[in-house]
Design a protein with these regions (language model features):
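N-terminal beta1-alpha1-beta2 module of alpha/beta enzyme domains
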Residues: 1-71, 177-178
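Acidic (Asp/Glu)-rich catalytic clusters
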Residues: 32, 59-67, 90, 94-101, ...
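Glycine-rich, proline-tolerant flexible connector loops at the mouths of alpha/beta enzymes
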Residues: 38-62, 77, 109, 207-210, ...
């Protein structure tokens, strides 16, 4: 099992923008030094607590500061961007990273982002599908382009000059394009079936109960079979909120205490998702009353925290429910205490993973 990381990120809105950007960059640089396989970075335009507004710009700032870690958008929210712009920008960063880029995509889940871009009342899933189809066509078809759609028409026919290169979008470094990765939230996700049919690979969200995470595998398997791909657990990434400490007292205080980053994270996530009518994501049973979905319940059921041996045991128990998967994605959280947060990443990479892979 490989180790990767993902961060939305999610920080207290009171913290300075410059400070949290530096902290998030330091987290990826540390992950690279510790041998993490990948780092996925989220993006949100209209959220002060989730302040990275462009995952591609953020990742570009890390190209010369990292050596081996693959850097992924987590995700580019396609309805909020013009497909031609994303095709060109992704091709550029893929060439700059020379094969270390992963193209994470989604329809976007932040409603205020959809609102500011004028997409609140549109079918954003339909926009997402049209956008990625346009992007793949731009990369694979010769110029001049003449792509028609419901939301975007893309052409360079009027101003195409082959001799000078005008009207031609650059293509990615990886052939035929960077690996496409999708985040999966909904239990028994039909969207995952469609993604797997196209050869895309999933990351299951870190704020889902284990039984809902487990529901993703049969959907991925079904999609792979329908698309003619091998359904291999090694291609399934599962995100999890984990805190590893040198002693149990510190683990519990930082991992579940009111002053810790995990408490802040899940308080924010619960408010957003429950406010958007999605309390079921936090329930282990859909018949569970909404009133039982408390913050303490969510922390106890979704955060893995403890000493090395305890965390290993908890991850094994988690896998007993989900089944095997290829990559454990360590969810990044605010560094309330930088030393404890860094130590957790070190223990995760140097002690927890070797024991899990024995």
């Amino acid at each position: 099992m490989k180790l990767s990381m993902f961060t939305m990120p999610l920080h207290p809105p009171s913290r300075s923008f410059q400070e949290v950007l530096a902290e998030d960059r330091d987290a990826v640089i540390l992950a690279d030094k510790l041998g993490f396989e990948e780092a996925f970075i989220g993006e949100h335009v209209t959220d002060r607590a989730e302040p990275i507004t462009s995952s591609l710009i953020f990742l570009a700032s890390l190209i010369e500061l990292t050596k081996t870690i693959k850097l992924g958008s987590g995700t580019v929210n396609l309805p909020n961007n013009h497909p031609a712009a994303i095709a060109a920008q992704v091709a550029m960063i893929d060439n700059m990273l020379e094969g270390r880029f992963l193209f994470g995509i989604s329809p976007g889940g932040l409603l205020s982002d959809a609102e500011i871009f004028g997409n609140l009342d549109k079918d954003r899933t339909e926009m997402f599908v049209e956008s990625i189809n346009h992007i793949l066509d731009i990369w694979s078809k010769p110029a001049p382009y003449n792509l028609k759609g419901k939301y975007w028409n893309i052409t360079t026919e009027q101003n195409f000059v082959e001799e000078t290169g005008q009207g031609i979008v650059v293509t990615p470094y990886q052939d035929p394009h960077p690996p496409i990765v999708v985040t999966v939230v909904a239990p028994f996700s039909k969207g995952l079936v469609s993604a797997a049919e196209r050869g895309w690979t999933p990351i299951s969200a870190n704020f889902l109960q284990p039984n809902w995470v487990a529901s993703h595998w049969p959907m991925y398997k079904k999609g792979c079979e329908q698309g003619g791909y091998e359904a291999n657990p090694k291609n399934w990434r599962v995100a999890k909120s984990i805190f590893v400490a040198d002693d149990e007292k510190t683990a519990q205080e930082y991992g579940k205490g009111e002053d810790g980053p995990y408490h802040f994270y899940f308080k924010q996530i619960m408010k957003k998702l429950i406010g958007n009518g999605r309390p079921d994501l936090f329930k282990h049973d859909r018949d569970m009353p909404d009133s039982d979905v408390t913050l303490d319940y969510v922390l106890d059921s979704l955060v893995i925290c403890g000493t090395v041996d305890s965390v290993v045991e908890q991850i094994e128990s988690f896998k007993d429910v989900t089944g095997d998967f290829g990559t454990l994605v360590y969810a990044g959280h605010d560094w309330v205490n930088p030393e404890l947060s860094k130590r957790s990443m070190e223990l995760m990479a140097n002690e927890v993973m070797p024991k899990l892979n024995k």
